[in-house]
Amino acid sequence: MSRRHVAEKRIILPDMKYNSILLSRFINNIMKAGKKAVAEKIVYSAFNKIEKKHSVDPYQTFNNAMHNVKPHLEVTSVRVGGANYQVPTHVDERRGYALASRWIINAASKRSEKMMIDKLAEELFEAANNRGVAIKKKEDIHKMAEANKAFSHFSPKKMK
């Protein structure tokens, strides 16, 4: 029997403006050093920038971006007979959105614009339109899963 304690999942309250748990998680991922007010300001300012520049609903753009970047497959490393295989596995919804938000934030922070507000606004808009670095990351993950399709019979769920 495992002695390891499984951490309970924390209840994340929805954000104040759009009443969305997904957006609240995204804000939490943006947050650095516990400065949630700064993270909220960055996200909401980016939403305002999207609305002014492209005249589209920023919340709908955010949802489209998250849905477009969310991966359906990923590879996990499985050891079989002394060899490690990259086995494609399905990504559950919660992990998919967590990966999507991480990829969007990383892609935004590496952009050339000066302020994070501008970087995030542009990356979200591009991801909503199936362009950008975050979408490329998802496509690379899917290509890797497709390339290792031959090892899918080593699926970790079947091994147990």
Curated annotation (Swiss-Prot):
InterPro entries: Ribosomal_uS7 (IPR000235), Ribosomal_uS7_bac/org-type (IPR005717), Ribosomal_uS7_CS (IPR020606), Ribosomal_uS7_dom (IPR023798), Ribosomal_uS7_dom_sf (IPR036823). Signal peptide: none annotated. GO terms for biological process: translation. Keywords: Ribonucleoprotein, Ribosomal protein, RNA-binding, rRNA-binding, tRNA-binding. GO terms for cellular component: small ribosomal subunit. PROSITE patterns: RIBOSOMAL_S7 (PS00052). One of its GO terms (molecular function) is rRNA binding. Pfam families: Ribosomal_S7. Belongs to the universal ribosomal protein uS7 family. Part of the 30S ribosomal subunit. Contacts proteins S9 and S11. One of the primary rRNA binding proteins, it binds directly to 16S rRNA where it nucleates assembly of the head domain of the 30S subunit. Is located at the subunit interface close to the decoding center, probably blocks exit of the E-site tRNA. This is Small ribosomal subunit protein uS7. It comes from Rickettsia typhi (strain ATCC VR-144 / Wilmington).
